[in-house]
Amino acid sequence: MHHHTRREFLWQTWVGSTLVCSIVEGWRDLLRAQDPPAPRYDLLVKGGRVIDPSQGLSAERDIAISGHNIAHVASAIPESEARQVLNASGKIVTPGLIDIHVHVYDGVAPLGIPADPTCVAKGVTTVVDAGSAGAHTFPGFRKYVINVVDTRVYALLNISVVGQSTLSTDNPYGELLDLRYANPKLAIRTIENNRDVILGVKIRLTRNIAGDHDLAALKLAREAADAVQLPLMVHIGGSYSPLKDILALLKKGDVITHSFRGGEGGILDDNGRILPEVRSAVARGVRLDIGHGAGSFSFDTAEKALRQDLLPGTISSDVHQFNINGPVPVA
């Protein structure tokens, strides 16, 4: 009987092991070749009507997403190419919506509501807070809201240093009843220090907010907006001064919010016709914003304006503490 030497034993063991490994690897390669390829996309939103004004698109499309990016948009993308498929048939699919008039300084402005549950969770990914904060309260707004929420929040700075922190259901006195609170110097400084998030200046001119010195306050807001070369948003309706005098101080790029409100100080004359001063303002580039709010929109005004070919430039919600849970009164 032949006894294997240690060298022969090691040689045979090595050859056998190598052969087994080669066979196993061969099977692995074969199985790997038969496996379906890994999905190209993380998520496929399938069959929805995609409305994307930036692309001039309003049609049924599939949208493939990889990571945080839109990877592909086509009329038909196979479901096998995505790890997860969301059936959007019968639904509208849009880019994140933008609302240019909200109030999200929760806990400081009585109107304020939490940004994320109201905005990004409902498909509104970018908002402009319209004057909740003034020069004295803006640092807190930036630190505790803008810098921490998932919603992308920009701001219009209130010309009043206290912002919208005074007026509430239990305290019917607005932020400009004392004209000394309108401080262009502080507004300009605050805007210059926060140019990345402040997009303009905001003023409210209702009687219980600006009193009988509304035009004086508006001129101070105009001064601040001009100094920083940013637009001015003006809350109209129920003011001491007539709308024509307010419009005379507005320029191209400025915004009238609550533009289709009913009642005193609106865009219609007593016969339901568009005021000529409104026509002139729009012609020189002043923009009309809906700013629906809790009582700042009138179907009657809107219908009369539309019949006279006057359209809003933007449709904003003016969402706040007193309309978030609805229903919202309309005239």
What are these regions (language model features)?
Residues 79, 83, 87-148:
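Metal-associated gating/positioning segment near the N- to mid-region
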Residues 300-331:
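His/Asp/Glu-enriched, well-ordered alpha-helical/loop segment
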Residues 250-255, 282-287, 307-313:
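Glycine-enriched alpha-helix->loop->beta-strand junction motifs that scaffold or abut catalytic
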Residues 126-130, 232-235, 288-292:
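Short catalytic-loop micro-motif centered on adjacent basic/acidic residues
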Residues 30, 35-44, 49-94:
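Histidine-rich, glycine-flanked metal-binding segment
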Residues 131-138, 145-275:
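Histidine/acidic-residue-rich, glycine-tolerant segments that coordinate divalent metal ions
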